[in-house]
Amino acid sequence: MEDIRTILDRIDYLVEAKETYVQAKLPYSRTDLAPVKSKETLDYHYGTLHKAYVDKANAGEGGDFQKAGAFLHNLYFPQFKKPGGANNPTGSSLELVERVHGSYDSFKEEFTNIAMGIQGSGWAYMDTKGSIKTIANHKVVNNIALLVD
């Protein structure tokens, strides 16, 4: 998992560049995340849905929904890495999780419960202060440290 400062820098960059959307390049192949995310899942969510958000946002279609979809997916996909080892947060990200939630396991349980409670389209994320929050449908926010679709 990336250091929180790297994530915040990426958010600042994306917010500043919000008028033109570019689909973030994947830092892994579409088969690298198996078995957590299959190639078919990535083909559909990245190759079809994310691309459509970017294309429609740049064409001025769909307003904030498309812009937020492009923005949020550009945060979502680059945060993953090929499975290996524990794949747990480290550094300042882990310190934040432990300070606010007590342990990474407690955080995972709370995060999963909140994320699974989202009805329809939406996102769960940990903000830069360690709180777990949700976004119903799509809305651009700039305090995201960890994002789960």
Q: Where are the regions a protein language model picked out?
A:
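Charge-dense, intrinsically disordered terminal/linker segments
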Residues: 1-20
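Feature for soluble, non-membrane regions of globular proteins
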Residues: 17-149
